[in-house]
């Protein structure tokens, strides 16, 4: 998706609730297919999730059909993390990191596109960092989910999401340098640059025991 200036979209990595993200996403999908039971069970057992939706005038206690908002909007709203006072947790990262990852000077401007093209998993590594990068980049796509209800939204494109455990694993792999760089990468130090800035974002999520969402607009 291009913005109105025909430039590449701006990519954002933001903290989300990673403790219920997998269950919530699956519940939304099942509800769209006519089975509200998982969604209702989750709403009834998770007051923060229920309150998030209610604050956005989306009461689904009587079923998904009672809320006209899209699945992508419900995903963003429902997984918004709150502090002890019920206020939204803000991403405490600096503008330099945000700008560096926002519109990378290569290809489609997506920093994960560059990583997935020019880096890889070391052959001796027992864990594959690329699997997590793939999920963060395409986990909510039509190609992965079989529908475009998360990928397409009025505010942009939701690319992928990692739950809390996956985010912790990614932080550990990035910190240990568990990735390799292709010798022919076009931007000298490009992979290392993206990994360095991405690690800052991931560490913030891990510090707060949260997951990570990748979207563009």
Predicted regions and their residues:
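A cross-kingdom marker for long, charged
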Residues: 211-213, 217
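Acidic (Asp/Glu-rich) sequence patches and key acidic residues
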Residues: 1-200, 204, 216
């Amino acid at each position: 998706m291009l913005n109105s200036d025909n430039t590449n979209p701006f990519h954002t990595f933001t903290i989300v609730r990673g403790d219920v993200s997998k269950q919530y996403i699956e519940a939304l999908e099942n509800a769209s297919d006519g089975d509200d039971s998982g969604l209702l069970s989750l709403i009834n057992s998770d007051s923060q999730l229920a309150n998030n939706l209610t604050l956005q005038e989306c009461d689904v206690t009587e079923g998904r059909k009672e809320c006209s908002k899209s699945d992508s909007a419900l995903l963003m709203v429902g997984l918004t993390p709150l502090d002890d006072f019920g206020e939204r947790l803000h991403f405490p990262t600096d503008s330099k990191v945000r700008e560096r990852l926002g519109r990378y000077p290569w290809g489609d401007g997506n920093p994960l596109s560059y990583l997935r093209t020019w880096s890889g998993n070391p052959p001796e590594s027992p864990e594959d960092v690329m699997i997590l990068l793939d999920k963060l980049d395409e986990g909510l796509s039509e190609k992965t989910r079989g529908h475009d209800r998360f990928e397409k939204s009025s505010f942009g494109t939701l690319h992928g999401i990692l739950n809390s455990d996956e985010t912790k694993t990614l932080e550990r792999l990035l910190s240990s340098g568990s990735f390799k760089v292709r010798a022919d990468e076009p931007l000298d130090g490009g992979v290392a640059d993206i990994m360095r800035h991405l690690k800052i974002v991931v560490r913030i999520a891990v510090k707060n025991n949260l997951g990570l969402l990748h979207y563009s607009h």
